[in-house]
From Swiss-Prot:
InterPro entries: Ribosomal_uS11, Ribosomal_uS11_bac-type, Ribosomal_uS11_CS, Ribosomal_uS11_sf. It comes from Xanthomonas campestris pv. campestris (strain B100). This is Small ribosomal subunit protein uS11. One of its GO terms (biological process) is translation. GO terms for cellular component: ribonucleoprotein complex; ribosome.
Amino acid sequence: MAKPAEKKTKKKIKRVITDGVAHVHASFNNTIVTITDRQGNALSWATSGGAGFRGSRKSTPFAAQVAAEKAGRAALDYGVKSLEVRIKGPGPGRESAVRSLNNVGYKITNIIDVTPIPHNGCRPPKKRRV
């Protein structure tokens, strides 16, 4: 009987990156934290929904804190020491995500707000009537 063909698997090489960029996208419903290298290649990411929060609890500052912590710990494997934080969006998890990344042990070099602001572009959604 013929022997099964041996599968050749390539071992994934972890590269060592000393400084990265943390992209925090804080919407009203969720918070997404992505840690990339300087070129924009993603090293790790986490969301408040993926951290176990559902419904209205996804949009809390604590959920953003847990998501940032999760993404930060995953990026430590690459040897990231310092982060530049880019915050986008008006959500409630903006400050708590940055504070959480600081508590994980990263040296935060600078914090930039990259929220897109229209120069009178699209018409905004109608106001809520509660």
